[in-house]
Amino acid sequence: MIDETLFDAEEKMEKAVAVARDDLASIRTGRANPGMFNRIHVDYYGAVTPITQLSSINVPEARMVVIKPYEASQLRPIEDAIRNSDLGVNPTNDGNVIRVSIPQLTEERRRDLVKQAKGKGEDAKVSVRNIRRKAMEELTRIKKDGDAGEDDVARAEKDLDKTTQQYTHQIDELVKHKEGELLEV
């Protein structure tokens, strides 16, 4: 019962870190990166679909992304979705592919993006702490019901704290890395 609780908590924390990693990847840096487009969706025959599933995304140069839709009819919707996103880029459509030139980030925009990255990191850490809190409540319930001894529960609580620290540290490292990418000129 205790092991199950710890395993579930660790699994959920791992997912929270994965979500944070994806969130941070979607914040654009000064370089072209296909991950920037992970959060952009297009209405594809009535279904909201990520553009990563509707096209191939290549980075031929450091500041250029080329998006080639699998269907030519999706050129305009993909272009519009990118233009309306919060990436701050202006795609051009040559009838065959969509080219997205990544402009140089201004110092002010870099600071805003660092704030955004820190906010996403903090959200992920809150999520990890909430998972810890729920697991602690479950451990308290196990102890109260007499399903496990006090020593076992205390040891499990210590393990849970170590796991929580490990995952919050991972999130801090992800944010620090992203901050370095953003501030690099």
Curated annotation (Swiss-Prot):
Pfam families: RRF (PF01765). Keywords: Cytoplasm, Protein biosynthesis. Gene3D superfamilies: 3.30.1360.40, Ribosome-recycling factor. One of its GO terms (cellular component) is cytoplasm. Coiled coil: none annotated. It comes from the Bacteria. The keyword GTP-binding does not apply. It is found in: Cytoplasm. One of its GO terms (molecular function) is ribosomal large subunit binding. Signal peptide: none annotated. CDD domains: RRF (cd00520). GO terms for biological process: translational termination. Responsible for the release of ribosomes from messenger RNA at the termination of protein biosynthesis. May increase the efficiency of translation by recycling ribosomes from one round of translation to another. NCBIfam families: frr (TIGR00496). PANTHER family: MITOCHONDRIAL RIBOSOME RECYCLING FACTOR PSEUDO 1, RIBOSOME RECYCLING FACTOR. Belongs to the RRF family. This is Ribosome-recycling factor. It comes from Mycolicibacterium vanbaalenii (strain DSM 7251 / JCM 13017 / BCRC 16820 / KCTC 9966 / NRRL B-24157 / PYR-1). The lineage of its organism: Bacteria, Bacillati, Actinomycetota, Actinomycetes, Mycobacteriales. The gene is frr.
